[in-house]
């Protein structure tokens, strides 16, 4: 099956990347380490640095979009410096010399010393003007690193939650490149619980309900219209899909070690 990405999920925001095959109970599953190109009227930002195995595909997709007339790529943003989210930053900085990287970048000046002058901090409430919209660093409610920052596009009201809203999908059922609402056969609670156990292990040792309540409050405060996660399918109908996500987070927090997997 050809790669269905890139896909324009709302006007001016493009979903880039390709699937990663994983195994679950002996069956093949697919997951994403997604990257998003956020275009304003004057310039664009790349959200997430990309996983190493995806970089060739991401670069080809990005070059094609820029050649089509998407405003110049000027900014890079990573939610946190874990490999699937930031490993490609050095390569992107090299390939696009007019860009600057933003985030809580910790020791990346040691990883990419040749680009240390192009690494910038990006704390909660900081924003970047892309022309006609701003990209804002917001609270990261569900995360695997304490310094994670989520991103938010103010004009299109799109939330970029990194490891939040993470779940796998079924390749054989045609879910690749789909919105969550288009993946009719997907067991979203189970796939959310699976990802929580593997990537958000701490959720099994806490009462998850305060986090769920804070997540709901943040979505209301920002008036989020679409969610673009790094490791899940985009969510276009929050009212229809979020109950399954909440159920999956609660299910994952109740599971004992190894149960169900």
Role assignments for model-derived ranges:
Residues 51-52, 83, 166, 234:
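Short, glycine/acidic-enriched loop or turn micro-motifs at the edges of active sites
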Residues 54-101:
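Active-site metal-binding motif and surrounding structural segment of the metallo-beta-lactamase
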Residues 225-261:
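Binuclear metal-ion centers of metallo-dependent hydrolases, dominated by the metallo-beta-lactamase
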Residues 4-63, 150-153, 157-161:
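Conserved beta-strand hairpin/beta-sheet module of binuclear metal-dependent hydrolase folds
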Residues 47-49, 72-81, 101-105, 159-163, ...:
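Active-site neighborhood of phospho(di)ester-bond hydrolases with catalytic His/Asp-centered motifs
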Residues 8, 94-229, 233-237, ...:
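Metallo-beta-lactamase
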Residues 20-21, 81-84, 140-144, 209-210:
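Short beta->alpha connector loops
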């Amino acid at each position: 099956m050809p790669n269905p990405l890139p896909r324009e999920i709302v006007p001016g925001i493009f979903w880039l990347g390709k699937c990663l095959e994983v195994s679950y109970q002996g069956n093949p599953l697919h997951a994403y380490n997604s990257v998003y190109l956020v275009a304003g009227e004057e310039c664009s930002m790349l959200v997430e640095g990309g996983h190493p195995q995806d970089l060739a595909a991401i670069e080809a997709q990005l070059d094609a979009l820029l050649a089509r007339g998407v405003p110049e790529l000027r900014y890079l943003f990573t939610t946190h410096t874990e490999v699937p989210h930031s490993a490609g930053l050095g390569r992107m900085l090299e390939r696009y010399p007019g860009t600057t990287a933003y985030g809580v970048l910790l020791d990346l000046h040691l990883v990419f010393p040749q680009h240390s002058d192009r690494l910038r901090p990006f704390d909660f409430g900081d924003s970047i003007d892309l022309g006609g919209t701003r990209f804002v660093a917001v609270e990261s409610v569900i995360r695997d690193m304490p310094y994670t920052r989520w991103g938010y596009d103010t004009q299109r009201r799109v939330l970029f939650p990194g490891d939040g809203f993470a779940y796998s999908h079924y390749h054989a059922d045609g879910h690749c490149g789909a919105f969550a609402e288009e993946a009719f056969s997907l067991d979203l609670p189970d796939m959310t619980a699976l990802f929580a156990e593997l990537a958000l292990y701490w959720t099994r040792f806490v009462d998850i309900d305060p986090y769920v309540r804070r997540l709901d409050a943040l979505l209301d405060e920002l008036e989020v219209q679409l969610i673009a996660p790094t490791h899940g399918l985009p969510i276009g109908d929050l009212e229809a899909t979020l109950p399954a996500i909440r159920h999956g987070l609660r299910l994952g927090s109740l599971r004992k070690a190894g149960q169900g997997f």
